[in-house]
Amino acid sequence: MSIWAIGDLQGCYDATQRLLENIRFDPSQDTLWFCGDLVNRGGQSLETLRLVYSLRSHSVVVLGNHDLSLLAIAVRSEEEQRKVNPDLLRIITAEDRDEILTWLRMQKLIHVDRTIGWMMVHAGLAPKWTTQMAEKLAHEVEQQLHGADYRNLLHSMYGDKPEWSPALSGCNRSRAIINVLTRMRYCTPRGRISTEDKGTPGTQTQGMYPWFEVPGRVERDLKIVCGHWSTLGLTITQGIHAIDTGAVWGGKLTALQIDTDELRLAQVHGLSIEHPRHTHTPRRQAKKHSKK
């Protein structure tokens, strides 16, 4: 049995299929961990979503910011829905949309497997959040998303503020938790997120740090695998394994086997487009699997 964590798919269906062939995925014994952002930009979001849905008995999904945006679009008026990009509109108008989107809404914001010592989150954790605290806070939002009043959450989750504080309540608290778990790249030691800084480390605003390098951050008892930050590139450092390698931007789609002591890496080429972006060299290289 193998457990493979897979970076942001973003509607890159063909690349996803090639990657599953590359790792010789066997649904009878293997498990896939999808790091979120299954949809948007890749042009085949409906096909990608259907594929992951078909693998639901053999996979775990955490929601990314694009997945949450899709769910929010689905509860808007038809007039507003017509304004979204064609890739997402195909999902909204699909015959099986209710079945697929209900399944998507029931997914987690954080997944933990303490038997192998790993946590999966789309973006990151606030500096003072232990893994136990992050699980608890994620569960708060998941309960709302899975409940009867989920539309209220989807309507109120947008906005860059407030910054996280334990004293927050209501929609402000939920929004702050969602922003940390699905949107964060850089933050201050106090946990204030920068939504403007999206480039490689060294290009950010003064006083901002990559979330996994913030001074004074708590020690964590689990290894973490995440996606979201394509300009960071493959980065393995201090128990953090960032595997969004920009498949939708002409980069690669990455899978990382996490149930063995020696990490194994598999990659396939993503979309054949050029997108101006910086690269970031991994600080520790995982063992490479065969490439296609």
UniProtKB/Swiss-Prot annotation:
Keyword set, alphabetical order: Hydrolase
InterPro entries assigned: ApaH, Calcineurin-like_PHP_ApaH, Metallo-depent_PP-like
Cysteines engaged in disulfide bonds, as pairs: none
Transmembrane spans: none
Pfam families for the chain: Metallophos
CDD domains: MPP_ApaH
Family listed: Belongs to the Ap4A hydrolase family.
Protein's UniProt name: Bis(5'-nucleosyl)-tetraphosphatase, symmetrical
